[in-house]
Amino acid sequence: MSQGMRQRVGIARAFALKPKMLLLDEPFGMLDSLTRAELLDVLVDVWSSEKITAIMVTHDVDEAILLSDRVVMMTGSPYAKVGDVLKVDLPRPRIRTEVMEHPDFYKYRGHLLNFLEH
């Protein structure tokens, strides 16, 4: 089974349990770009229909903007703490191919990148 298929199965199994909250740690980290895009679309669709609260760890700024209502940015190690919280106020449902065309996307992206650079 490919890595992408294993990720799909893992996400499907998690949602099949009907959790009230879902914790995801770099769920797309080991995937190629095409598989990542497909799974992002699947995750957005499932979240739209299931309305499950999810907490996700990611280092991908664009992924964070697409999937999040709030992005909690952590300071560096070894004593990491909350450094900033960005409210992402983009309309839902979000479509991956359209989010980057929204006028506020690059404002959010710039805010996140600025935090990461300092």
Functional labels for PLM-detected ranges:
Residues R36-E50:
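Helical segment within the ABC ATPase nucleotide-binding domain
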Residues S2-R8:
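ABC ATPase nucleotide-binding domain "signature motif"
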Residues I11:
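Hydrophobic anchor residue at the start of the ABC signature
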Residues K51-V57:
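Conserved H-loop
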Residues L22-D25:
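Catalytic Walker B motif of ABC-type/P-loop ATPase nucleotide-binding domains
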Residues L17:
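Conserved signature/switch motifs of ABC ATPase nucleotide-binding domains
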Residues S77-K107:
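Conserved beta-strand-loop-alpha-helix hinge in the C-terminal portion
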Residues L66-M73:
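Conserved catalytic segment of ABC-fold P-loop ATPases
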